[in-house]
């Protein structure tokens, strides 16, 4: 399958630049792939009538965008990705062709680092002191994606994180979760709607476009995740009772599908990793997740391919076209979709 089959054109005016005035107030498009039906709702709060068992990803996006001064006194932007050791990190770097192995950079508080190795725009940084999460919290900005074309705003520190985020480790926020408000969680409890949490740390590769000409040739990145024993038991019981499992965000779906043993009807629990790549043509059979809540995804991304596998590629592109024509807002701060079943 050709990667370009997952391209679509989108006016910049439909890429939402700011969060909604209130969590949950974004528009919701409800989709039934089996009946090929599309329903338009004026807010995410309309989700309640469709659901009875939800699973969220409670990873928290690290404040990871930071600026340093090069030996030539120019400003260089780094996006911290993963911790290798107490003073070793992988990172993406701006002006990457000019940043070479052996270069030194001055960070806030006089912290120095050196590029130890480099692969394209990704580098390994060695700091001259150990670096804790408190340093990033103090000196870094939240990692807004490149399609948000504006200056950083203080509101992003709150609204680019979900209200239930708990464990720092993601390179980017699992943004469909941004819609969920405290009022909506209260409504879950008042309506006896179950919810639980897993933790999957979102990697940079999640949101990058597929570069290979053929989808099948894409080298899928690994992401680490954790499913606790008691969460696994609750989910397994919900499934046995015939409840329909709603995955909040695609990253949650990847973790659940990677960990669930369809023969034993059980999850593997504890710390794990996955490079599961779900796309149309793979003939992937979804084992555990029945419904999916997510945002609109970027062209040629693995997330768009996953949704196309879940709901059917032709149906996905038909409702994307309808959403564009009706002025839905796209991507991280945009509107949401609820897919009621998979094909």
Curated annotation (Swiss-Prot):
GO terms for molecular function: S-adenosylmethionine:tRNA ribosyltransferase-isomerase activity. It catalyses: 7-aminomethyl-7-carbaguanosine(34) in tRNA + S-adenosyl-L-methionine = epoxyqueuosine(34) in tRNA + adenine + L-methionine + 2 H(+). GO terms for cellular component: cytoplasm. Its main location: cytoplasm. Gene3D superfamilies: QueA-like. Monomer. HAMAP family: QueA (MF_00113). NCBIfam families: PRK00147.1, queA. Transfers and isomerizes the ribose moiety from AdoMet to the 7-aminomethyl group of 7-deazaguanine (preQ1-tRNA) to give epoxyqueuosine (oQ-tRNA). This is S-adenosylmethionine:tRNA ribosyltransferase-isomerase. It comes from Borreliella burgdorferi (strain ATCC 35210 / DSM 4680 / CIP 102532 / B31) (Borrelia burgdorferi). The gene is queA.
